[in-house]
Each structure stands twice: as structure tokens, then as C-alpha cells.
């Protein structure tokens, strides 16, 4: 079969609330990939198959997901975002498009990713933010939380924070930045940048961090849990709704 002429990359933002993650699902379950591929097929005049930088879970959001696909469609790349967005629901938006090199892969060419996790400290539930933050109803010790996050910076074995029964891959990753920011009105954002992340890694780190902030786990105990490389010692995974894929790094791709 003849290779398709163009490799097109897209940057995509989406609200993951109503989708069963990014990765294509079988009807009646709908994922972001299902919706995006259907719209692209209409614009390109042929079926396309997306490769994505990250397979976000159900309820997880993205500001800067990156995908690529091969096509013989002739639409100018500058017109592609507007054409596709006209066919997409309002909770999925193509923000950029560019012609990529044939060997570019949104997944395999990535050199790093940035995630942000959002927390809101509330006295009562907030119905307007419940799908976009982890709502916490007790005071949090921000200094203690920052102290344990600092332990995670560097190249480490993150087995304690991987998904239970996760795929057999190396648990060693490098996190070169973890930053907890107070945004006012009881809102916190935690930015994490690294060369890669294990499945559920960010959400499990957030779960343990919040347990420290609530005084349920001491800073010393957090360090012991991290060193133990045992997922069973970490509290249940934090909610998906607070997690956002912020951006993906590439060596030679415009950002």
C-alpha cells in the first residue's frame, strides 16, 4: 500500500468530563479520539488514524495534547484547525496544526511532558468546579506538601506511585520540576515536568501529597513510602478531574 503523502500534527485542547479518556473506544462508549478522527475524516476525505502523545484517562483534561496522522487530503494546514473545529463539539478544540516530518510521532518523538493538577480547598462542595478540581474540605499544610514534593525531584524509581498491576515497564523516570502554587480563593496548582510518567503516577503522587497536607502521613513516612517502591502503601488514587496534560516537549517541533 502506498504511503500517504502528508504527516500532519495537531495540538488539541479538551474538557475530558464527558469522554472515556482519549484512546479510541468501541460504541456506545465515546473517547476524544473517536470524535476527533470522525471530524478529520470529513475534512480530509478519508479515514485517518491518530497517534497521541498521551492516552489521558476518563475525566482527565488537556490544554496541549499533541497528535499526528498521515493523509492524502489536500486541505492547507493553515485552514485545518478552523475546518475541523466547525465539526467538533465545543469541549474539543484543535488549537494548532503543522506539517510534520515523515518520521515525526506525537508519542515516540516526545522528549518530555508537563502536567498540572488542580486542587480547591472548600468549606462546602462547589458545583461549578467539581469536574475540574479535586475538592478538599479540610485545611492543608502547604509547607509540608512542598517538602515531600521536593523529595521526588530527580531521577528515581517511582514504583510506589505507579498504577497497581501496571504494565511491566521500567519505573525509573526523571522529574526535573515539581511546583506547588497558591492561586488564591483556596485554589492550588501543582505543575510536574518530566521525561515521562508512569500510568496514574501524577494522581498517586497527588494522593500521597494531600495525605501529608491533611496530617494523615508524616513527611518521614512519605519518604519511607517512596523508598519502599510499593504501590500498596500509597492512599487511593486522586480523582481524574483535577489532572490536565499541559504541554508536550519535542526536539524540533514548534510549540
State what each model feature region is.
Residues 1-255:
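Structured-RNA-binding interfaces characteristic of tRNA pseudouridine synthases
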